[in-house]
């Protein structure tokens, strides 16, 4: 049986056009975002499936170096005698969110045992 022309048994062409319009133009608008996400997903897949090569280990070693240099910068030279007599300051640095995130990343990188990361600056 075929539904009558005025019945609601089948979605109207206006409704179908609206659905097409919304989905098509949302897809067109997000085209650049989709390209970036696809590239990131592809790079992540390649990185995860790659064997532990020298390039991979060098990347992790450099990342650890930069994180540690950001976490523990060199102490500035003391300018006056009073501060020199007092001695270098202890571990009283304020934990900012960025420093906390760096410490978390650093600890996670140190705990990964699947990658042969050279333990530098430990």
UniProtKB/Swiss-Prot annotation:
Chief place of localization: cytoplasm
Gene Ontology CC: one annotated term: cytoplasm
Location of the protein in the cell: Cytoplasm; Nucleus; Membrane
Membrane topology: Single-pass membrane protein
Identification of the protein by name: Uncharacterized protein YBR090C
Highest taxon of the lineage: Eukaryota
Keywords per UniProt: Cytoplasm, Membrane, Nucleus, Transmembrane, Transmembrane helix
Organism: Saccharomyces cerevisiae (strain ATCC 204508 / S288c) (Baker's yeast)
Membrane-spanning segments: 9-25
């Amino acid at each position: 049986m075929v539904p009558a022309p005025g019945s609601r048994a089948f979605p109207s062409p206006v409704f179908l056009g609206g659905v097409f319009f919304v989905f098509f133009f949302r897809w067109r608008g997000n085209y650049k975002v989709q390209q970036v996400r696809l590239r990131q997903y592809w790079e992540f897949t390649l990185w995860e499936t790659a064997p532990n090569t020298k390039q991979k280990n060098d990347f992790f070693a450099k990342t650890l170096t930069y994180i540690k240099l950001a976490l523990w910068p060199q102490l500035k030279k003391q300018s006056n005698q009073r501060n020199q007599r007092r001695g270098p300051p202890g571990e009283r640095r304020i934990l900012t969110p960025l420093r906390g995130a760096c410490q978390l990343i650093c600890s996670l990188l140190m705990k990964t045992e699947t990658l042969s990361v050279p333990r530098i600056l430990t």
